[in-house]
Amino acid sequence: MQNAEAAPALLAAHGLVGRRGGRRPLDLNLRPGQLVHVRGANGSGKTSLLRTLAGLLRPRRGEVRWNGADIHADLPGYYLHMAHLGHDNGCSDALTARENLRYALHVAGAPRAEPELERALRDWGLAAGADAPAARLSQGQGRRLALARVMLSRKRLWLLDEPDAGLDAASLQRLHGMLDAHLAGGGAAVLASHRGGGAWAGCTQTLELDEYAHAEVVGADCLA
C-alpha cells in the first residue's frame, strides 16, 4: 500500500452541506488506504451523508469529487469505481443467493467466474442455502450476501452504511478482514456504524455526528 498521506485524494468533498442544512460545511480528502468511520445516533445524518457521497442525493451546497472530477458530471463513470451498501441488502426474493450474487456483480460491471462466487458463498457461510430463494435468508444472511457482493466487486471505494447490522461474531471478524485487505490493496472506505472507533482496524478517522447536526472530527488526516 502506498503512503496514504502522500497519495492524491480519491474522494474529496468540499464545503459539503446536506439537503437538510444546519451543519457546518464538511471537507474531506480520502486517500488510498484510508477509512472514515461515521458515528452518530439515529437521525444524525449518517445515511444522508453516505447517500450524498454515493451520488444518490445532491448536496445543498458544496461538491463531491472522484479523482478530481465532480461525481455528478459522470455518475456512471463514478459507479465503475464505487460500491455502496445501504440499509437494504439489495437482494431479490425471487432469485437464489447464488443468482443474486451473480446478477448484482454483472449489473455492477464486475462479473466473476463461478469458482469465485462459490468461494465467496462458502467463506460467508452461505453455501448450504445458496440455491434456495433469497426470501428465506435471515437478516444476517442477507447482510453477509450483500457484503460478499461488495467484496467481489473490487471497487476502489466502498461506502458502507451499518455493514455490521445483524452479523454474528464470526461474520464480524470476516468483515474486519475484508476491510483490512481492501485498505491494504489501496482501496478506501467510508463506513457508518454505532460501534466504537477502535472496532475498525485501519480506521484513520472518526466523524461524530449528533442529532443537532453538529459534526466533530476526531483526528485530522483526511477530514478538516
Curated annotation (Swiss-Prot):
Gene Ontology molecular function terms on file: ABC-type heme transporter activity; ATP binding; ATP hydrolysis activity
Enumerate the UniProt keywords alphabetically. ATP-binding, Cell inner membrane, Cell membrane, Cytochrome c-type biogenesis, Membrane, Nucleotide-binding, Translocase, Transport
The reaction(s) catalysed by this protein are: heme b(in) + ATP + H2O = heme b(out) + ADP + phosphate + H(+)
The top EC class, named as a word, is translocase
Q: Which family does it belong to?
A: Belongs to the ABC transporter superfamily. CcmA exporter (TC 3.A.1.107) family.
**Known role:** Part of the ABC transporter complex CcmAB involved in the biogenesis of c-type cytochromes; once thought to export heme, this seems not to be the case, but its exact role is uncertain. Responsible for energy coupling to the transport system.
| Name of the protein described by the UniProt record | Cytochrome c biogenesis ATP-binding export protein CcmA
